[in-house]
Amino acid sequence: MIEKSIKAEIVKANARAANDTGSPEVQVALLTGRINELTPHFKANAKDHHGRRGLLRMVSRRRKLLDYLKSKDADRYTALIAKLGLRK
């Protein structure tokens, strides 16, 4: 799990308004943080298939949110993937 202070930092860095916690940008950033935190675990524990299922679920959810954001506002999408260092 992400520590509360780190989570608040991520929300603050990606929020569109002062109390924004539910925008796609914030949700994608939080999922990216959780995914990045779990990656070393799976390098050390390659046979943790039950945990990997949860990781793949998070990756899929992030992909769906990114697809939604791309369809609604392509400029925000490109800015977000550049900021988070995802692909391209």
UniProtKB/Swiss-Prot annotation:
InterPro entries: Ribosomal_uS15, Ribosomal_uS15_bac-type, uS15_NS1_RNA-bd_sf. The keyword Ion transport does not apply. Keywords: Ribonucleoprotein, Ribosomal protein, RNA-binding, rRNA-binding. GO terms for cellular component: cytosolic small ribosomal subunit. SUPFAM superfamilies: S15/NS1 RNA-binding domain. GO terms for biological process: translation. The keyword Nucleotide-binding does not apply. It comes from the Bacteria. PROSITE patterns: RIBOSOMAL_S15. GO terms for molecular function: rRNA binding; structural constituent of ribosome. Part of the 30S ribosomal subunit. Forms a bridge to the 50S subunit in the 70S ribosome, contacting the 23S rRNA. Belongs to the universal ribosomal protein uS15 family. NCBIfam families: S15_bact (TIGR00952). One of the primary rRNA binding proteins, it binds directly to 16S rRNA where it helps nucleate assembly of the platform of the 30S subunit by binding and bridging several RNA helices of the 16S rRNA. This is Small ribosomal subunit protein uS15.
